[in-house]
Amino acid sequence: MKNCLFTLVAACLACAGCFDNHNRPADVFTVTSLDALANTNRAEIVRLFLRGAARPVTDADLEGLSDSVLQQLDLSELNLEKVPGKVWGLKGLTSLWLVRNKLAAIPDEVPQLPALTYLNLDGNQITAVPDSLSGATKLRWLRLNENKLRESPPSLSALKDLRRVYLRKNLLTSVPEVVREWTELEDLALDDNAITSVPDWLGTALPNLKSLSLKGCPISRMPDDLSGLRGLTTLSLANCPLPSEEVVRVRKALGDNVAILF
C-alpha cells in the first residue's frame, strides 16, 4: 500500500509540473519523502524525489541506495550549497535535479555519473560552466535557466549528444560559440538574456534544430542566411525589437511550416 501511495503522489506532482516528464516509467519503485525513505529498503529504490524536504538531505540519508538500481534523484529546493558526496557514487543515475538550491558552481564531480543524460540546475547562483562538465559525454538534456552565466567554455564541444539546452534568464550577451558544435541539438532556449545579435552560423550550423527561443532578447536582426533552420517547427522572437521589415523577411525565409512567435 505504501509503495502505491508513493507512486501516486509522484504522479500527481508530475502532473502539477513539479517534475519534468521525460520518459519516466510509471511502474517503478518511487519514494518521495525522508520519512518514507527511513522505512524503505533503499536498495530497491529506482526514483528518489526529496524536493523541498523538511530538513537538509545528508550523506546518511543516501546511504544504502543501490548504485545500479537508482536512476532518478531530485534534491531540489533544499538550500544546498554543496551536493552530498554520496550522490557521485550512484553510477546508474540517469537524471539529476538540483533546482533552486544555492549552488555557486556546477560540481566538478558530475562526470563521475557515467549514465547521466539529464541535468537540471535551474534557479541556482552559477556564474560559469567548468571545463570538467565536458566529461559528462552522455548528457542529452541540460537546464541552467535562471543562473548568472555569462559564457560557456569551448571545451563543452565534447558534449556531442546534447539535444536540449535551456539557458533562459542568465547574463549572456551573445550566443555561446560552443553551441555551433552541438550539431544534434533539437531545442535551444536563450530567452531573456542580453543577447543583442544572432551569429550568422546559427542559421546554418544546427541542421537538427526544431525549436529556437530568443524571447525577450534585445535582437533587431536575424542572420541573413536562414537556410539551415528549415527544420525548425517553432521560433520564438516575442518581445524582441525586430522592425516590421525584418519580421516579413524571416517569415518569408522560413516558410509556412515554422510557427513563428513575434
Describe each region flagged by the PLM.
Residues 78, 101, 121-124, 144-147, ...:
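Consensus "Asn ladder" position of solenoid repeat domains
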Residues 193, 205-221, 228-262:
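Leucine-rich repeat domain C-terminal region
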Residues 2-72, 82, 239-241, 245-262:
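N-terminal capping/linker segments that flank leucine-rich repeat
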Residues 70-102:
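Mid-chain, structured segments of secreted extracytoplasmic proteins
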Residues 48-50, 71-75, 94-98, 116-121, ...:
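Conserved hydrophobic beta-strand positions in leucine-rich repeat
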Residues 57-60, 65, 83, 106, ...:
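Canonical leucine-rich repeat
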Residues 64-69, 88-93, 111-116, 134-139, ...:
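Leucine-rich repeat
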Residues 143-204, 211:
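Eukaryotic tandem repeat interaction scaffolds
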